[in-house]
Design a protein with these regions (language model features):
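Generic, well-ordered alpha-helical scaffold segments in large soluble proteins
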Residues: 13, 37, 41, 45, ...
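Carboxylate/His-rich catalytic cores and anion/metal-binding grooves
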Residues: 218-256, 275-294
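Single conserved hydrophobic/aromatic residue that forms the stacking wall/gate
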Residues: 306, 310-315
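Long, structured ligand/cofactor-binding scaffold of large enzymes
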Residues: 46-50, 57-130
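Residues forming anionic-ligand binding surfaces in small-molecule and nucleic-acid pockets
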Residues: 86-108, 241, 246-269
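Extended, charge-enriched "interface" segments that sit outside catalytic cores
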Residues: 1-56, 60-62, 66, 72-84
């Protein structure tokens, strides 16, 4: 892509999203416009890559992990899409440094350490080597924490990364998965078939949002599907009666699952929350994998076309 072509795409995006010209756009607006351009291109590339993989019968790989340390996406996305030089020159003509735009992006609050970095590298590696790969994790509202030292003491603050990072995410509420907690399981056999009935359960809806990882030199694209926990409905009856706390408690309990990466587990409540997070991720992801397979092939007889890996190298 030429500098002139990229400059037009960038200006069109700034106009449609913010109604501004490049010459007066803020650095935050330019960052978001560039992110949207990359996201759209990667989404289109992923659709083509996925269709080709299904058409050739390639095995699809799914990687589940509680964290993905993705870092910042703009620089790598522009580079892997082959747009870095064009973007740099287009901005330079407006006397804007691309490096200064990179600084507008927060680190994604989806990972913390080596486990998450390993997971992110697997996604990048699968995309670059043209393996049809999908990562699954939780869309944490807050990263683990931001550290600040005051008078020699550490103070922890919430890592509110979504205001700057959500531009990379595409929500798909139509593909939500119901995850059931608690309740009772009843099972019986009838004419050789095993029937399971789940009663008195509490439902939490797993709402997926997707972000993409472009492989180097445009070879392949990996998808990271992130689950956000939501209550299935709102208790309007309690709210109408003035029982506001009761009405909100169901929503708060559900949304707590995707609130914070690695909640403190030095107490029983924290241990329970971590267990709920792990079950939520597993149940939503397996449900999504099975549903996608049935939509594509109409049968589970060829489920060996899927390969699922749970990242358990770290306790």
């Amino acid at each position: 892509m030429t500098t002139k072509e990229f400059a037009k795409i960038l200006q069109d995006k700034l106009t449609s999203e913010y109604g501004v010209d490049l010459s007066v756009a803020s650095h935050q607006q330019i960052y978001r416009a560039l992110a949207l351009i990359c996201r759209q291109m990667m989404s289109e590339n992923h659709k083509k890559f996925q269709s080709k993989a299904i058409g050739t019968g390639s095995k699809q790989v799914y990687y589940l992990c509680m964290e993905f340390l993705m870092g910042r996406s703009l620089k790598m996305s522009l580079f892997n899409l082959g747009l870095n030089d064009a973007a740099q020159k287009a901005l330079a003509e407006a006397d804007i440094s691309l490096d200064s735009i990179y600084e507008e992006e927060p680190d994604a609050g989806l990972g913390n350490g080596g486990l998450g970095r390993l997971a992110a590298c697997y996604l990048d590696g699968m995309a670059t080597t043209s393996i049809c790969g999908t990562g699954y994790s939780i869309l944490y509202e807050y990263g683990i924490f931001k550290q600040k030292i005051v008078d020699g003491w550490q103070q922890e603050r919430a890592d509110n990364w979504l205001p700057g990072g959500q531009v990379w995410l595409k929500s798909h509420p139509d593909q939500a998965v119901e995850v059931r907690f608690d309740g009772e399981i009843h099972e019986n056999w009838d004419h050789g078939f095993h029937y399971i009935q789940h009663t008195n359960y509490n439902s939490v809806m797993a709402i997926p949002s997707d972000m993409y990882v472009q492989g180097y030199d445009g070879k392949g694209v990996a998808k990271l599907r992130l689950w956000q926990a939501k209550a299935p409905d709102f208790d309007m009856s309690s709210f109408s009666l003035g029982n506001y706390n009761t009405a909100m408690s169901k929503n708060a309990s559900a949304e707590l699952i995707s609130k914070v990466l690695y909640p403190n587990d030095n107490h029983v409540e924290g241990k329970i929350l971590r267990l709920r997070q792990q079950y939520f991720l597993s149940a939503a992801s397996i449900g999504d994998i099975v549903q996608n397979h049935l939509s594509t092939y109409g049968t589970l007889e060829n489920l060996d076309r899927k390969s699922t890996r749970l990242n358990s190298s770290h306790a």
